[in-house]
């Protein structure tokens, strides 16, 4: 087998090995988009004049939050927090599961340009 064929086989195997991960990530982001539209958009996509929630277009705001780590973002989104900035637990939708809230956070980070 020549070197080109070997490299092609290796590249194909690597691509196929990653396919389930990409499909899983895509499904998670689709869930996040659905949750965002139903429960998060009213605060996070309305403009700062309406509230102090970070908007999807505000990459700097999201970078600051992402710097705390996803576990902290997930915790704050699930449990809520109060103070100068406040957010109700689960964005005000008690019916959301932890995984749904986490998917919405992941979706918002991706939409804000943060991986």
Name each model-derived stretch.
Residues 50-51, 76-102, 108-115:
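Axial heme c-ligation environment in periplasmic c-type cytochrome domains
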Residues 19-35, 50-64:
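Electrostatic cytochrome c docking/interface patches
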Residues 57-64, 68-71, 75, 79:
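Surface-exposed, polar/charged faces of alpha-helical domains
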Residues 1-12:
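Bacterial N-terminal signal peptides that target proteins for export
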Residues 40-47, 104, 108:
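The canonical Cys-X-X-Cys-His
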Residues 10-21:
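Hydrophobic alpha-helical targeting segments used for export or membrane insertion
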């Amino acid at each position: 087998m020549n070197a080109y064929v070997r490299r092609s086989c290796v590249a194909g195997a690597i691509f196929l090995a990653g396919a389930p991960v990409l499909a899983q990530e895509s499904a998670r982001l689709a869930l996040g988009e659905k949750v965002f539209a139903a429960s998060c958009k009213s605060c996070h996509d309305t403009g700062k004049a309406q509230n102090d929630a970070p908007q999807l277009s505000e990459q700097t705001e999201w970078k600051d939050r992402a710097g705390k780590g996803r576990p902290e973002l997930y915790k704050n989104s699930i449990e809520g927090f109060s103070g100068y900035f406040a957010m109700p637990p689960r964005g005000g939708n008690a019916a959301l599961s932890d995984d749904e809230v986490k998917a919405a956070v992941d979706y918002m980070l991706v939409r804000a340009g943060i991986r």
